[in-house]
């Protein structure tokens, strides 16, 4: 759980200072897929208190990177045992959890190494839609305004 929270907080620290052309971080490694941003003034260091706008505990285990569209930060998530697969939407400004949507119940999850997670792939987001895959367990599209699974 600490790792998932750290990803969210570190991603949001950088996300809070994105330049106008980098306002959205729609995929793994950003808009161009190269991990670069044109933003300036980003923090070079942070700790539990330094350069952190907010912290939000998120249960579960996930290695996926967060994606950002407007004021929404979306995270793929899974229970430790892989029986529940979900996405979480956090408000970029306040850190409040806006949605915690269970997408799949998995009766018999496939093997997952203890150093991995059932929520490893980073989602992809565009205006109004979030796409997330959990491998053999399923792929989903979520309406980001309503939370409906499409």
Task: Place the predicted regions along the sequence by residue.
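Noncatalytic, solvent-exposed loop/strand surfaces
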Residues: 18-150
């Amino acid at each position: 759980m600490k790792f998932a929270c750290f990803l969210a907080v570190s991603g949001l620290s950088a996300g809070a200072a994105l330049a106008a052309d980098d306002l959205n971080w729609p995929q793994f490694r950003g808009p161009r897929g190269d991990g670069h941003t044109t933003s300036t003034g980003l923090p070079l260091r942070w700790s539990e208190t330094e350069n952190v706008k907010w912290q939000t505990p998120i249960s579960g285990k996930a290695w996926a990177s967060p994606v950002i569209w407007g004021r929404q930060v979306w995270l793929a998530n899974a229970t430790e045992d892989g029986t529940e697969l979900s996405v979480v939407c956090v408000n970029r400004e306040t850190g409040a959890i806006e949605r915690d949507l269970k997408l799949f119940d998995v009766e018999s999850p496939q093997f997952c190494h203890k150093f991995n997670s059932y929520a490893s792939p980073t989602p992809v987001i565009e205006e109004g839609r979030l796409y997330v895959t959990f491998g053999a367990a399923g792929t989903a599209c979520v309406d980001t305004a309503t939370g409906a699974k499409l």
